[in-house]
Structures are given as C-alpha cells and as structure tokens.
C-alpha cells in the first residue's frame, strides 16, 4: 500500500513533504531549516540533523 499522501506523487506543504508521507518519489521544495542552516557532510548526517532531509543533503 502506498503512503497516506501517495497518489501519483507526494502532497507537499510549506516546509517540505506532508507529515506521514512515505512516498519514495517525493520531490517537495526544501524546508527552511535545511536551506538556511544545514551544513552536513553526508546524507545520513543530514537526515539526523534536519527535521526533514531536504535538497541541501549531499546526493
């Protein structure tokens, strides 16, 4: 079963993806916390430091 906000894509809201979103193809705008203050060296570190890992995370 897809996540709660999955139809063709995730539902976005201000700050990133809608809460509870389990969609792996989600492409929401980066949240303010990440765009303003995320200085992480790795994707794993970013996911722990930021409330929602965003586009600031290393690929």
Swiss-Prot record:
A divalent metal cation 6 binds at residues 40, 46, 50, 57. A divalent metal cation 3 binds at residues 10, 17, 26, 28. InterPro entries: Metalthion_crustacean, Metalthion_dom_sf. GO terms for molecular function: metal ion binding. A divalent metal cation 4 binds at residues 31, 34, 50, 54. Keywords: Cadmium, Copper, Metal-binding, Metal-thiolate cluster. A divalent metal cation 5 binds at residues 34, 38, 56-57. Residues 1-29 are annotated as: Beta. Residues 30-59 are annotated as: Alpha. It comes from the Eukaryota. Binds six divalent metal ions. Known to bind copper and cadmium. Belongs to the metallothionein superfamily. Type 3 family. This is Metallothionein-1B.
